Each structure stands twice: as C-alpha cells, then as structure tokens.
Amino acid sequence: WFDLEKREALVEYPGDAGKFFRDTLCRGAFVAFLAREKGTKSTWLLDVAYRAVRQRRNVAFFDAGDSTEEDVGIRFEERICRWPSYSPNDDGTWPAEIKVPKKIKIDKGEDLAEVTEWHRREYPGPLTAEMAIEGNRKLKEKLASDRKFWKLSCHPNLSLGVGNIKSIILGWALEDWHPDVVIVDYADLLAPPPGRLESRDQINRNWQLLRSLSQ
C-alpha cells in the first residue's frame, strides 16, 4: 500500500508555482522540462537547483551543452543574488528591466498554465563580485553548515553519456557525498548510448537510461 501523502518533496515552491508542481519534484521522480530552443529551460533547471540547495538538498548538476564551469557558476550566482550579470537589452545597455511570472492559472481541462501577473524589476547595472560574495555569505548563513550541497560537472556536447554520469556519481559516493537531486542540462546533447541504433532510438534509449538514475 502506497501513501501518496507521504511522498517526500525534495524541492518545494511557494505560491502558485507550488500549486503547479505539488509533489512532482519528489524523491524517486523523473521530471523533464520541455520548451522551444532558447526557451529558458536552463534558467528553470538552475532555479530548481538553487531552491534544492536552500532546502539543504545535495544537488549534482551536469551540463552537457559546452558550457564551462565559469559560465554555469556565473548563472548560479545570478540566481543566488537575483541580479543579472548581462543586460537583456538588445544593445547591452543599462538600466535593464526583467519580468518574471508572479501568478499563474490553469483552466479546468487545460494542460498549460497561463501567466496572469508579472513582477517587473529594473536593474541599474550588472552583478558585481562584491554582490556575489555577499549573496553567498547570506546563503551560507541560511544553510548554517559548511557541508557542500552543490557539485557541478560540465562537458562538451556529445561527450557525456549516462554511464559517465553514473560513474561520476559513484566517485562522489566514495567521498561520502550522495546527491538527493540530479539535474542534467542539455540532455538532448548527451553522447549516444552503446550499440548501433538509429538516431531516434538513441534518444529514446538515453531517456530510458536517465530514468534509471532516479530508481
């Protein structure tokens, strides 16, 4: 007998986002974020990682899309400080305005949520090193621990396979570090699985192997 009320949510969101996700982001779950190209998937995945860390979860973040550790690190600092390091304006100038969803609704019978209210904020300039240091200090103060909650592993596209991910996680386990949450950004750029498979079959097989990470 399974008690759905006892499913452990590893990452919880407040407000409407919390109602949307409910306990989807729970232990043992496999969740895929789908969007068009340049559709903020990476932003969402980093947000999930950040919230998991704030909730004292061990997070393993794999980037398979050619980003460097510095690239991902800067984006993570942006999320910690809630402050951009690059202007979204076409000409790259400051000040810059950024809007994020504040309220959403899902009509009965619909699969997609609609944003009904946005939060707008203007930034006079880019994120600075001093701001990042202060943001990390506040996060460490909240966590009240010297334990490492975040591990990052970046790889060129088509060079990282699911088997490699499992090996890296096993290596961390030998150091007595065990992830609660495993996030793979650019999963569509993972190396093909072993064996001679058609392109579509390779993609399907990789998704099956990724699912096994949570089991």
Where are the language model's segments positioned?
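P-loop NTPase motor core
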Residues: F2-D71, R79, C154-Q215
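Cytosolic-facing regulatory segments adjacent to core modules
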Residues: E12, A17-F21, R57-H178
